[in-house]
């Protein structure tokens, strides 16, 4: 069997950003594509963790990565917030993640993050793309990227939604430039859906939610669905076959391999109730 990619960012309906699918939907989609792991990264919350744990505990065969999308800033009042991702390497990292969220998901410095037990990532569709639009050189981009372990790269159609860059060739050149800066700073560039729904057709449901939430350009949202490995490779074929495989499959698996197996369930025997399983999860992840 060919090696499969790992999606390092999915948003579930337990978050507040308009996702329409639950954790079970995503986990099933990943398993159908034989993906070895999946990261749950809701924005500013971790309410999906117990349900995700229960799904993996029931199904088995896939590594669950516990993560979250938070924000960092520079100015004392944090007028501009910049999104980034945190993934827990182990149970200690999960506990540290809980502490960060409890303190506040918007006002801590990256220097306060325990890098021993946590993995930090940033998306191209955040501070990076804004700096590029403002004319930043590679040295300035490198100063941003070097603080993270990986950078998430999206399909080209995402650029029109996040940055209003409609020129496909320009978007491709920006992606190539980010990959080059990542490699010069020993940071992993990784392809990601940053998914908000499982199937392409679910986009209409999210559009309705965004419209209800008052998002003005909701009709322009890209296809933020959970792509299979072959679909993601096709999105990045403009990089060449070898480079596309590297950022889609190789690098995503490298991050997944950084996550140890301390989250493997110890309640594999039959006969446990849902309440017992969730109680076990809370106890082992907070003690």
Predicted regions and their residues:
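Phosphodiester-processing cores and adjacent nucleic acid-binding clamps
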Residues: 1-287
């Amino acid at each position: 069997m060919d090696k499969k990619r790992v999606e390092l960012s999915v948003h579930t309906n337990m978050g507040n950003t308009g996702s329409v699918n639950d954790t079970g939907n995503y986990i099933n989609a990943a398993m159908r594509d034989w993906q070895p792991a999946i990261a749950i990264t809701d924005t500013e919350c971790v309410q999906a963790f117990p349900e995700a744990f229960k799904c993996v505990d029931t199904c088995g065969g896939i590594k669950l990565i516990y993560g979250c999308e938070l924000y960092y800033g520079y100015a004392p009042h944090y007028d501009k917030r910049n999104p980034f991702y945190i993934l827990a390497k182990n149970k200690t990292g999960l506990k540290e993640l809980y502490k960060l969220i409890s303190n506040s998901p918007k006002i801590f410095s990256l220097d306060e993050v325990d890098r021993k037990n946590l993995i930090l990532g940033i998306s191209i569709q955040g501070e990076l793309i804004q700096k590029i639009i403002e004319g930043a050189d590679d040295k300035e981009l490198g100063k941003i990227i070097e603080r993270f372990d990986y950078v998430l790269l999206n399909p080209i159609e995402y650029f029109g939604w996040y940055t209003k860059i409609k020129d496909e060739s320009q978007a491709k050149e920006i992606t190539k430039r980010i990959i080059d800066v990542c490699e010069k700073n020993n940071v992993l560039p990784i392809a990601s859906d940053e998914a908000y729904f499982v199937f392409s057709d679910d986009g209409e449901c999210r559009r309705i939610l965004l419209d209800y939430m008052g998002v003005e350009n909701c009709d322009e949202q890209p296809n933020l669905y959970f792509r299979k490995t072959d679909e993601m490779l096709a999105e990045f074929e403009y990089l060449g076959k070898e480079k596309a495989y590297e950022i889609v499959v190789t690098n995503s698996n490298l991050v997944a391999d950084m996550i140890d197996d301390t989250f493997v369930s110890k309640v594999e025997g039959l006969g446990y109730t849902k309440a017992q399983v969730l109680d076990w999860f809370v106890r082992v992840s907070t003690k």
